[in-house]
Amino acid sequence: MITITLPDGSRREFEGPVSVMQVAHAIGPGLAKATIAGQIDGGHLVDASDLIEHDAMLRIITPEDQEALDIIRHSCAHLVGHAVKQLYPEAKMVIGPVIADGFYYDIYSKRPFTPEDLAAIEQRMVELIAQDYHVVKHITARHDVVRLFKERGEDYKLRLIEEMGPEVTAMGIYHHQEYVDMCRGPHVPNTRFLKAFKLTRISGAYWRGDTKNEQLQRIYGTAWADKKQLEAHMQRLQDAEKRDHRKIGKVQDLFHLQEEGPGLVFWHPKGWVIWQTIENYIRRVYRNSGYGELRCPQILDVSLWQKSGHWDNYKENMFFTDSEKRTYAVKPMNCPGHVQVFNQGLHSYRDLPIRYGEFGACHRNEPSGALHGLLRVRGFTQDDGHIFCTEAQIESEVTAFHRQALQVYADFGFEDIQIKIALRPDKRLGDSLSWDKAEAALRAALSACEVEWQELPGEGAFYGPKIEYHLKDAIGRTWQLGTIQVDFMMPGRLGAEYVDERSQRCHPVMLHRAIVGSMERFIGILIEHYAGIWPTWLAPVQVVVANITDAQYEYAERVHKALLNQGFRVNTDLRNEKIGYKIREHTLQRVPYLLVVGDREKENGTVAVRTCSREDLGAMSISAFVERLQAEQVV
């Protein structure tokens, strides 16, 4: 007998091995119809057809469960393959993973796909779903899978199998009628679960993400549990399109990018004002938190990057240059430079912690296809800081950073923060004991702050685990921004030492920290978060003074000068245009305040105040308006 325990504590007994679907049928036909997969003993997910061969706790996954989304999306990727192979038999399928809010499938085809092809593929998927067919899984011996894909000419599937270790002797093959694909699963048992999907776009990609390899075509899509969720997502995409930082950046004349410098930003005067405002704010954070601001070289001999470990773990993403028979690397990270500053002179344990901060300009050789406005660039500047401390000081330093980061995010208008700990990856420096200590220190610090967090196994940096801060924006999207990482490795590799209380030389612990991360990316996120309607303290132009007629020209200039003297960013609009035209123009430019001056305002020494949201605040004295502006300043 096999006993299956359900989430409500009830039990069902079966004569022998039983599938998830059979358990669902035993409970009721309604549940069986809704069953997508199962979760065994609170662990991994399995297909509805998988057998349970021992006493177990079972949670049946239906479209109501969050876990169902990834299963639906992965199954939709296979459905893309089914449709593509029916329409374009010569195409070769590569790989189709789940991504945030959707999925993609990489395909090799000599014939470039067009928007019309995308529509045809989507229509064929709709037709296949309407056939309401079962998705059938077979565990198949490796040699049989190789034979199957050889017969079908699926060269990329064969390459994927070649990359698997010898321990993989069998794998799951999923049958969508005549189409087959390999996967760990689980997948939906029937295509009726895939109705709420939409193909969104086609882009280029490369095999294994390497530009030296052949180019592929990537079909993106999104899929949800029901039509209502899909419609809500598509509405969010429309909202995001309106907030696209590239469009707003052009309209507001903030920045541009061009072909001669892919992934490198040209900042215009208004955009640079925003940059400087944020930089000054972060500089104040450095100062108030005991950081010494420094500046390190842009290029350093590769020998330093070899010592630091970046050469072995990161060289594919680095730029290099040669001079006088020496090879230099353009820095992709700031940390080795900060260690060099620490190494100038011998430190006592009484000196620790020592905190350095830098607006460090870095360059990384990102694939051209991955570049995206300000959000993914090759040249960027980080609010990068490093803390050199003892093991006993880790918890207090991480705790202080955590509280500091939350205040910064609140000042920039982010209140919904998710905290995650990224744990040791397979490819890493150091021994397991050091990683155990580092991960325990991060958990202890967050426990001291009484916050909840999620753990991400395998997603830490190669030199240490990290805390990540994920911020939700105005339309519900989540962005990963700040990090603090424990690093027991780099100080030792680069010879950083201090003298402890026993007069012994020791390597300090190094904490890598950033609150906003890439300044470019952060500004891109802010543009989209605020939809270009900047809070007054961040706005490149905070106030425009506009006259109604030439009779107020001199008074408008006096108002302008009075506000400039208070340190505000003020322009005048003294053109011979109708005041309604001026109001519309500056409202579209999202200038927070427009001060209209006519004969009445000139006579009374006041200004008529309007906001970019078209709110009329009436007449104010200049001093009253100054007080209002000062109350809105953060830095």
From Swiss-Prot:
GO terms for cellular component: cytosol. Keywords: Aminoacyl-tRNA synthetase, ATP-binding, Cytoplasm, Ligase, Metal-binding, Nucleotide-binding, Protein biosynthesis, RNA-binding, tRNA-binding, Zinc. Belongs to the class-II aminoacyl-tRNA synthetase family. It is found in: Cytoplasm. Its main location: cytoplasm. The keyword tRNA processing does not apply. Gene3D superfamilies: 3.10.20.30, 3.30.54.20, Anticodon-binding domain, Bira Bifunctional Protein, Domain 2, Threonyl-trna Synthetase, Chain A, domain 2. Homodimer. Zn(2+) binds at C335, H386, H512. HAMAP family: Thr_tRNA_synth. It comes from the Bacteria. SMART domains: tRNA_SAD. GO terms for biological process: threonyl-tRNA aminoacylation. Residues 1-62 form the TGS domain. Binds 1 zinc ion per subunit. The lineage of its organism: Bacteria, Pseudomonadati, Pseudomonadota, Gammaproteobacteria, Lysobacterales. Its cofactor is Zn(2+). Its EC number is 6.1.1.3. GO terms for molecular function: ATP binding; metal ion binding; threonine-tRNA ligase activity; tRNA binding. This is Threonine--tRNA ligase. It catalyses: tRNA(Thr) + L-threonine + ATP = L-threonyl-tRNA(Thr) + AMP + diphosphate + H(+). PANTHER family: THREONINE--TRNA LIGASE, CHLOROPLASTIC_MITOCHONDRIAL 2 (PTHR11451:SF44), THREONINE-TRNA LIGASE (PTHR11451).
